[in-house]
Amino acid sequence: MFSKSVTLAQYDPDLAAAIAQEDQRQQDHVELIASENYVSCAVMDAQGSQLTNKYAEGYPGKRYYGGCEYVDIVEQLAIDRVKKLFGAQYANVQPHSGSQANQAVYASVLKPGDTILGMSLAHGGHLTHGASVNISGKLYNAVTYGLDENEVLDYAEVERLALEHKPKMIVAGASAYALQIDWAKFREIADKVGAYLFVDMAHYAGLVAGGEYPNPVPFCDFVTTTTHKTLRGPRGGVILCRDNTHEKALNSSIFPSLQGGPLMHVIAAKAVAFKEALQPEFKQYAKQVKINAAAMAEELVKRGLRIVSGRTESHVFLVDLQPMKITGKAAEAALGKAHITVNKNAIPNDPEKPFVTSGIRIGSAAMTTRGFNEADVRVLANLVADVLSNPEDEANLAKVREQVTALCNKYPVYGA
């Protein structure tokens, strides 16, 4: 029998110490990685619940195990809430990740060797959209589109490649593209060649939920998202459809094809996050995320930095560091010393290797969750620029770190 009175710190002090150190790091550092966010205590409570004990292969009302009557309620709550959130008729909340959700979409209607048309990883796409190092680029004949000379998504190229290659599926969505994507234009192109349209909105889902980014669901055959990032839930994935045409194929692609038992504790946490995103205050959050991203980009431009695509219309943007004569890798390290967390990121046509890069990616979701407003963000942007203009000066880094600490103390991640 397990005792509820035995704490992690008592049983495993080494692990507890590492967790405590990470907790302190999150408090003391400003998080600007676009794919990261903070979840509520309610989300963590659900994910840390005894639902982790329950195996539940199958779907609500149709399980391969007994004793699933209560986890059925949990999963159905998650399904109903996410359908309401995005106006979908179909939802599968079992994918363990966005990548597995994407794999399931491909497997539901494609055969190995079929042609897919997705955004180039080098221009801001995602590994799972046909990159040669990913299973999507190994199983399928992947053709890629990118940005035009103004660093705007090249819809003319998308149409030209679609007409030339006749893909069975067109993939839209990105992991490092700042501007809004025209889902209706993608639908028009897909219809011209009889292709399925699949949108991966993992980065934008929270903005979509908050009404600050166009909803792809009405235009697409398939939509996937992660449940973290801007949606502010646990790490996991979801598949959505505007109707139930592909329900059977998608369900079987997840189980039994790609996964076994679902992670019921994570699905419970997803349900909590979906409820949070349905609240009026989430709309204000999404609005502030966009305001903060735009303010930071604007302030960095004032300091002489170049923003890829010239601006942002979402939560994310790329900074081209080539004029600063510093690599993304070096910038990430220097900013880290100042307690500002970013990730190095390739820019379009980047001459550097993927582990070096010529840019960094900045996102506003996590700092907005903490409570940062536009004025705070402008201060922070100047601190970022201070580091990038003198990345090897330890006194400069210490001065910036002190100011970052003051900002972090003003906005604790978790209050009383």
Swiss-Prot record:
Its EC number is 2.1.2.1. The record marks H228 as: Plays an important role in substrate specificity. The modification N6-(pyridoxal phosphate)lysine is found at K229. GO terms for molecular function: glycine hydroxymethyltransferase activity; pyridoxal phosphate binding. It is found in: Cytoplasm. One of its GO terms (biological process) is glycine biosynthetic process from serine. One of its GO terms (cellular component) is cytosol. Homodimer. This is Serine hydroxymethyltransferase. It comes from Neisseria meningitidis serogroup C (strain 053442). The lineage of its organism: Bacteria, Pseudomonadati, Pseudomonadota, Betaproteobacteria, Neisseriales. The gene is glyA.
